[in-house]
UniProtKB/Swiss-Prot annotation:
GO terms for molecular function: nuclease activity; RNA binding. This is Endoribonuclease VapD 2. Belongs to the VapD ribonuclease family. Its EC number is 3.1.-.-. Coiled coil: none annotated. Cleaves ssRNA, mostly between U:A. Homodimer. Keywords: Hydrolase, Nuclease, Plasmid, Virulence.
Length: 94
């Protein structure tokens, strides 16, 4: 399983996002990622489905930055992770 995670510079978004408030940018990214086979997990972390591979992750991020130029301008960090196991630790602290 692969994941994409990123951090956006909110000051940069405030200056470069075309909408009323930069908070809407996160909704646009969320919708885009879901449309491209990812599931939102938390914050700016998206897990890919069974058909998502490393090449697809790169292509999706490129497509995202082409569709929303403010993304590539304002992203401080964007990573692809390969996840061997997805274990929920919540039961360990409940």
């Amino acid at each position: 399983m692969y994941a994409i995670l990123f951090e956006l510079d909110t000051n940069c978004l405030n200056d470069n996002y075309e909408g009323n408030t930069y908070h809407n940018s996160y909704k646009l990214v969320n919708d885009f990622m879901i449309e491209n086979g990812f599931t939102w997990k938390q914050g700016s972390v998206y897990f890919g489905g069974a058909n998502i591979d490393a090449v697809t992750c790169v292509l999706v991020v490129q497509k995202l930055s082409k569709k929303y130029p403010w993304f590539s301008t304002c992203v401080k960090d964007v990573r692809m992770l390969r996840i061997e196991e997805n274990n929920d630790l919540l039961p360990a602290i409940s």
